[in-house]
Curated annotation (Swiss-Prot):
Belongs to the UPRTase family. It comes from the Bacteria. It comes from Oleidesulfovibrio alaskensis (strain ATCC BAA-1058 / DSM 17464 / G20) (Desulfovibrio alaskensis). This is Uracil phosphoribosyltransferase. Catalyzes the conversion of uracil and 5-phospho-alpha-D-ribose 1-diphosphate (PRPP) to UMP and diphosphate. NCBIfam families: PRK00129.1, upp. InterPro entries: PRibTrfase_dom, PRTase-like, Upp_B, UPRTase/APRTase, Ura_phspho_trans. Its cofactor is Mg(2+). One of its GO terms (molecular function) is GTP binding. The lineage of its organism: Bacteria, Pseudomonadati, Thermodesulfobacteriota, Desulfovibrionia, Desulfovibrionales. Binds 1 Mg(2+) ion per subunit. The magnesium is bound as Mg-PRPP. Pfam families: UPRTase. GO terms for biological process: UMP salvage; uracil salvage.
């Protein structure tokens, strides 16, 4: 398993704004999608392509296109929806698979309440999106679910991640790569990332 912290001035600038406590809901949504676009660019560098011929303005042209069944994006509800448009802007043909989970605030373990996966998911690469990788429990459970459905190629995109969550995923699924805008310091006693973003779901949906 590899962890890629995307080191880019635009990512750093936008993430810095996301961390501010007074950022408006509309701006938080926009920034989340903007950072997701930049992460998507990095996370898809190794996609396999194939040559094909298309009709150009001056005749046939040989071009390269992504090979195979391509991508399914997997937003973890609800906060993952805040990054969905950003990824679909980059890969508009991606199929969307939805996983609904919430974290039990007493045990900090995930509870699954909804699943709808793309057809032929065993032939696709799944990209899981969620603003925060905290304890890692939700991500491990999502990967378990995808692998049980036959998916073999999985990676995750996150705005921020805690070292504790990264280690948990590494131990459970060493074949899954993670792309993140920043690896933060630690989790607090309640399982929240420090310095983190606060409650990303509330900030995206304007709830408290």
């Amino acid at each position: 398993m590899a962890v890629y912290a995307v080191d880019h001035p635009l990512v750093k600038h936008k993430l810095g704004r996301l961390r501010q406590s007074d950022v408006p809901v509309a701006e938080f949504r926009a920034l989340s999608n903007e950072v997701c676009r930049l992460l998507t660019y990095e996370a898809t560098k190794d996609l396999e392509t194939e040559k094909t011929q298309v009709e150009g303005w001056a005749g046939p042209v040989e071009v390269e296109q992504i090979k195979g069944k391509k991508i399914t994006v997997v937003p973890i509800l609800r906060a993952g929806l805040g990054m969905l448009d950003g990824l679909l802007d980059m890969i508009p043909g991606a199929k969307v698979s939805v996983v609904g989970m919430f974290r039990n605030e007493e045990t900090l373990e995930p509870v699954t309440y909804y699943t709808k996966l793309a057809n032929n998911i065993e032939e696709r690469q799944a990209i899981i999106i969620d603003p925060m990788l905290a304890t890692g429990g939700t991500l491990v459970a999502t990967i378990d679910l995808l692998k049980k459905a036959g998916c073999k190629q999985i990676r995750g995109l996150f705005l921020v991640a805690a070292p504790e969550g990264i280690k948990r995923v590494q131990d459970a699924h060493p074949d899954v790569d993670i792309y993140v805008a920043a690896v933060d310091d630690c989790l607090n006693e309640n399982g929240y990332i420090l310095p983190g973003l606060g409650d990303a779901g509330d900030k995206i949906f304007g709830t408290k």
